[in-house]
Swiss-Prot record:
Main location: cytoplasm
One Gene Ontology term from the biological process aspect of the record: formation of cytoplasmic translation initiation complex
Entry keyword annotation includes Transcription regulation: no
Name by which UniProt lists this protein: Eukaryotic translation initiation factor 3 subunit C
GO molecular function: RNA binding; translation initiation factor activity; translation initiation factor binding
Acidic residues: compositionally biased ranges: 18-30, 37-59
Keywords: Cytoplasm, Initiation factor, Protein biosynthesis
Gene Ontology terms: cellular component: cytoplasmic stress granule; eukaryotic 43S preinitiation complex; eukaryotic 48S preinitiation complex; eukaryotic translation initiation factor 3 complex; multi-eIF complex
The protein's assembly and partners: Component of the eukaryotic translation initiation factor 3 (eIF-3) complex.
Family per similarity comment: Belongs to the eIF-3 subunit C family.
Record lineage: Eukaryota, Fungi, Dikarya, Ascomycota, Saccharomycotina
Pfam families: eIF-3c_N, PCI
C-alpha cells in the first residue's frame, strides 16, 4: 500500500455523496489557510521521524481516499487522518496560527468598504482646494460602489451615507464664485446629483446627522432593515427584482428603474426575470412619461432575452408585440405632449422630463421603428425555422396581419411626428418593411391586408403619402406600391433604389401588366449591375425574371416567356438562386458565421414560386417552339438554330428515345414528353389532354383562360408540325380537311400556312379561293433517307468513341 494514504483515514460510503458538494464560504477560508502551510508541510514530510515499516503497518488496514479525498472534512480541518501528506511530526497549532497571520484575505465586502473609505478621503482633500472635478468623480465612484453593494446583497454601507452628507455639506458651504467653466460645471452637476441621492436616502441621512459618531460605529444597513433601494439588490448569479412593484411606491419609480438599467448587460443576469420585474414595475407607473420610459426599457429587455436563440419564442414575441402596441397607444393619446423620436436630444437624467419645444411637445429619445424592425425580423426567423408543411407554420403565418398592422400604424405615427423635410429619408426603412409583405401578393390578397390594417389604425391619423378614403380599389393598391417605391427611388442608397425598382416590376408583372413591367425593368438597367449587388438583391432580381416569364405565359406570349426563362433555367441550382432552399441547408453549406447573412439567402415558404410550375411553363413553351422546328429540320428545311438548355424539350426527347423502356407518363416531365410525341404525330387532342392533366396548372390564378389559349396555340403548332411532316407525301392539301382535323377555322389555317411558307421559303401556293394548297416537289429527303442519315450519324459518333485518336486525324 502506498504511504500517501494515511492509516487513520476511514472510508464512509454514506459520506461519498457529500464529496461532490460545493465548498461553503467558511470551508473555503479554512482550505485557503491550510494551503498557506503547504510548503512547510512538504518539508516536514521528508523529515518525518516515522519509519517505512510504520507506514506499511498502518496501511495494511486502511482504505483508499478516492478521487475527491482532498475535499474531506478531516483534510480541511487538519485532523489526524490523512494529514501526514501535508503535515510533519513537528507541526503544531501555533505554527498554523503564525502562518495564517502572515496574510490577511479580505472579503469582497471589506474591499468595497475600503474603496469607499479611500474616495471619502479624496473628497476631504479636494474640499480644501475647491476641486469640484475631483469631488464629482469620487462621488460618482461611490455611487457606483453602492450599486455594486446592493447587487451583492451588502445593503447600504454607513460610509456611503457619510459621503453623501459630506458632499451635501460641501455644496452648502461653497459660497465662492467659480470662474473656471469646467469647475463650475462639475459643481452644478455634483449639486444636482447629491440633491437627488439625498432625497432617496432621507431617513438614513437624518439618522446620521443626529449622532454621526454612533452612526459610524453601527454595522452597515442591511437589505431588510430599510425600504431603501437596497431592497432591490441583485444577487451574485441572478437578478432578484421581485420587490420592485411593492416598494417602488416608497422609493419612487425612477430609483427602482435605475437598478434595472444597471443590471442590464451584466453577466449571469436572468433576462426573463429582469423582464418580469420590469413588467411589474410598469404596473406601478402613474404618469404618461413614466409609462413611456418603462416601455422603452422593457421592450429592449424582452428582445435581448432571445439573442442567443434561433428566433424569439412565440409567447415572448406576442408579449413584445403587445408592449409596442401599448406604447403606440400611449403616444397616440399624448401626441401633443410627448413624442418619441430618433432626432430627440439625449437626456442625462431620465427622472427629469425633457424640455418642451416651441410647440409644447417634449421629445423623448427612442426608436419605435427599431422595435418594429426587430419584431418583423423575429417573425421571419420563426417562419424559416418552422416546418412549412406543418400546421404550426400556418398558425404562425396568421400573425403576418398583426405585424403588418403595426408597420402601418408606425408609418402613420412617424408621418405625424417627423419634420416634413426629413420624412422621406427616415421613412425609407418602414417603406421597405411594408413592401416586403405585399409586393409578391396579388391585388386580392393585398386588399384584404389593407382593409384589416386600416380598421385598427387610429382614426385621428391621415397619411399624406398613402391616403386612404375607405375604398381599396385596384388603382389604390397600385398607387400604394408606386408611392412607396418612388419614395425609395429618391434615396441616395443604390441598394434601396434597385430594390424599389424590382419591387415595382414584380408587382406589376404579377398583376398581368407584362409589357409595362418589362419596359420598366429595361429602362432601370438594373440587370447591368446586378452581379455586383448583395446576394439578397440578386435573389430578388431572379424572382422578378421568373415572374416576368410567368406573366408572359399567362398572356400566351410563348416566345417572350421562353426567351426570358431560358438563361435562368439553364442553372442547375434554381432553388438556391431563387432563395428557396431551407435555412438548415444554407447553414450546412455556407461559409458565413453570421446568422443574419445566412437568413438573407432564404425566403419563407409562403413567398416561394413553385418550381414545378416554372418547369411546366418552360417545357410547354419549349414544346410549342421546338417541336415544329425539329420537324422542319428533319424534313430537309434549312432553319435557324436556336440555343436550348438542359431542360428543353429537345434534350428531353433525345434522352427519352434512347431509353430502353418507355412506360406510361408518371411525372410532370413524362406528361410533357408524351404530349410532344403526340404532337409530332399531329394528334393535338391527345397532346392537349396530356398537358391539361398536369396538376401544376392549378397554381395559376387564371388557369382556365390560360389553358384555353394554350389549346388554340397547340392546334396551330400541331398544324405546322403536320405540314412539315407530310408535305413530301402530298401535292395538294385541302383547307377544309385540315380545318376538320385541327378544329380551326379555314381562314386561321390559311393564315398559319401562309406564314410558314413565307418564313421558310417553301415552294407552295394557294389557289384563287384559297381552298387548296399546291405543293411543288423539292429537294427534300424521303423518310427512308432521313432514317439512313440518322443511322450514318450514329455510326460516326460510335466510331469516334471507340477510336478517339482516329477521329482527331
Amino acid at each position: 500500500m502506498s504511504r500517501f494514504f494515511a492509516a487513520s483515514y476511514e472510508y464512509d460510503s454514506a459520506s461519498s455523496s457529500s464529496e461532490e458538494d460545493l465548498l461553503s464560504s467558511s470551508e473555503e477560508e479554512l482550505l485557503s489557510s491550510s494551503s498557506l502551510s503547504e510548503e512547510e508541510s512538504d518539508d516536514s514530510f521528508f523529515n518525518d521521524s516515522e519509519s517505512e515499516s510504520d507506514f506499511d503497518s498502518d496501511d495494511s488496514d486502511a482504505k483508499p481516499y478516492g478521487p475527491d479525498w482532498f475535499k474531506k472534512q478531516e483534510f480541511r480541518r487538519g485532523g489526524g487522518g490523512g494529514n501526514k501528506f501535508l503535515k510533519g511530526a513537528s507541526y503544531s497549532d501555533s505554527d498554523e496560527s503564525d502562518e495564517a497571520s502572515k496574510k490577511v484575505v479580505k472579503s469582497a465586502k471589506e474591499k468595497l468598504l475600503d474603496e469607499m473609505q479611500t474616495s471619502s478621503g479624496k473628497i476631504d482633500a479636494a474640499e480644501l482646494t475647491n476641486d469640484w472635478i475631483t469631488i464629482l468623480n469620487e462621488f460618482d465612484s461611490v455611487t457606483r460602489l453602492l450599486t455594486r453593494a446592493q447587487q451583492q446583497n451588502f445593503g447600504t454601507p454607513n460610509i456611503f451615507v457619510k459621503v453623501v452628507a459630506q458632499v451635501e455639506d460641501a455644496v452648502a458651504a461653497s459660497q465662492e464664485e467659480i470662474n473656471n467653466k469646467a469647475v463650475a460645471k462639475a459643481f452644478n452637476t455634483a449639486k444636482q446629483r447629491v440633491k437627488k441621492i439625498s432625497r432617496e436616502h432621507q431617513t438614513l441621512l437624518a439618522k446620521y446627522r443626529e449622532d454621526p459618531e454612533s452612526f459610524e460605529k453601527e454595522t452597515s444597513v442591511e437589505v431588510d432593515a430599510t425600504p431603501e433601494l437596497a431592497q432591490f439588490a441583485v444577487g451574485k448569479k441572478t437578478t432578484d427584482l421581485s420587490s420592485i412593484a411593492t416598494t417602488s411606491s416608497e422609493t419612487g419609480f425612477f430609483p427602482a428603474l435605475s437598478i434595472v438599467l444597471d443590471s442590464r448587460g451584466k453577466k449571469n443576469i436572468d433576462q426573463q426575470a429582469l423582464a418580469q420585474s420590469m413588467d411589474d414595475l410598469l404596473q406601478t407607473t402613474k404618469t404618461p412619461y413614466e409609462k413611456i420610459i418603462a416601455y422603452l426599457t422593457l421592450i429592449p429587455i424582452r428582445l435581448d432575452s432571445s439573442t442567443n436563440l434561433s428566433y424569439q419564442p412565440i409567447d415572448q414575441w406576442k408579449a413584445t408585440y403587445n408592449d409596442v402596441s401599448s406604447l403606440l397607444s400611449i403616444l397616440d393619446e399624448n401626441i401633443n405632449t410627448y413624442q418619441v423620436s430618433e432626432l430627440a436630444p439625449f437626456n442625462d437624467s431620465l427622472e427629469n422630463e425633457p424640455e418642451a419645444n416651441e410647440k409644447g411637445v417634449k421629445t423623448i429619445l427612442g426608436s419605435i421603428l427599431s422595435f418594429v424592425d426587430r419584431l418583423d425580423d423575429e417573425f421571419t426567423k420563426s417562419l424559416l425555422n418552422t416546418d412549412p408543411h406543418s400546421s404550426d407554420y400556418l398558425i404562425r403565418l396568421r400573425d403576418e396581419q398583426a405585424i403588418y398592422n403595426l408597420i402601418l400604424r408606425t408609418q402613420l405615427y412617424l408621418e405625424a411626428t417627423l419634420p416634413e423635410d426629413r420624412q422621406i429619408d427616415l421613412l425609407s426603412r418602414i417603406f421597405v418593411r411594408r413592401l416586403n409583405h405585399i409586393y409578391y401578393k396579388s391585388n386580392e390578397l393585398i386588399r384584404i391586408m389593407e382593409v384589416a390594417a386600416w380598421k385598427v389604425a387610429p382614426s385621428s391619423y391621415t397619411s399624406k403619402l398613402t391616403p386612404y378614403d375607405g375604398a381599396v380599389s385596384d388603382s389604390y393598391l397600385s398607387g400604394v406600391i408606386s408611392t412607396l417605391t418612388d419614395a425609395l427611388s429618391k434615396q441616395q442608397n443604390q441598394s434601396l433604389r434597385k430594390r424599389a425598382v424590382l419591387y415595382n416590376v414584380y408587382y406589376t408583372a404579377l398583376n398581368k401588366e407584362f409589357q409595362v413591367a418589362k419596359d420598366m425593368l429595361i429602362e432601370s438597367k438594373v440587370q447591368s449591375f446586378i452581379n455586383k449587388s448583395d446576394p439578397s438583391l440578386q435573389i430578388l432580381f431572379n424572382r422578378v425574371v421568373v415572374q416576368l416569364g410567368l406573366s408572359a405565359f399567362k398572356l400566351c406570349l410563348i416566345e417572350e416567356c421562353h426567351q426570358i426563362l431560358n438563361d435562368l433555367l439553364a442553372s442547375s441550382h434554381l432553388r438556391e438562386i431563387l432563395g428557396q432552399q431551407t435555412l438548415q441547408r444554407v447553414t450546412a453549406h455556407s461559409n458565413s458565421s453570421n446568422a443574419d447573412e445566412r437568413e438573407k439567402l432564404c425566403l419563407p415558404f409562403h413567398e416561394h414560386i413553385n418550381l414545378d410550375l416554372i418547369d411546366v411553363v418552360f417545357m410547354t413553351c419549349s414544346l410549342l417552339i421546338e417541336i415544329p422546328q425539329m420537324t422542319a429540320f428533319y424534313s430537309g428545311i434549312k432553319i435557324k438554330k436556336i440555343p436550348y438548355s438542359q431542360k428543353s424539350i429537345r434534350r428531353a426527347l433525345e434522352h427519352y428515345e434512347k431509353s430502353s423502356f418507355q412506360g406510361p407518363p408518371e411525372t410532370l416531365r413524362d406528361y410533357i414528353l408524351h404530349s410532344a410525341k403526340e404532337m409530332q404525330k399531329g394528334n393535338w387532342k391527345k397532346s392537349f389532354e396530356l398537358l391539361k392533366s398536369i396538376q401544376a396548372w392549378a397554381l395559376l390564378p387564371n388557369s382556365a383562360s390560360v389553358l384555353d389559349n394554350l389549346a388554340e396555340r397547340l392546334q396551330v403548332e400541331s398544324l405546322k408540325t403536320y405540314f412539315f411532316t407530310n408535305k413530301r407525301f402530298y401535292s395538294k392539301l385541302s383547307m377544309k380537311k385540315l380545318s376538320d382535323l385541327f378544329n380551326l377555322p379555314e381562314d386561321k389555317i390559311v393564315e398559319s400556312l401562309q406564314a410558314v411558307i413565307t418564313e421558310y421559303e417553301i415552294d407552295a401556293s394557294f389557289n384563287e379561293d384559297k381552298s387548296v394548297l399546291s405543293i411543288a416537289k423539292g429537294a427534300e429527303i424521303t423518310k427512308l433517307e432521313e432514317v439512313a442519315s440518322k443511322l450514318n450519324k450514329e455510326v460516326k459518333i460510335t466510331k469516334e468513341r471507340l477510336h478517339p485518336s482516329r477521329g482527331r486525324r
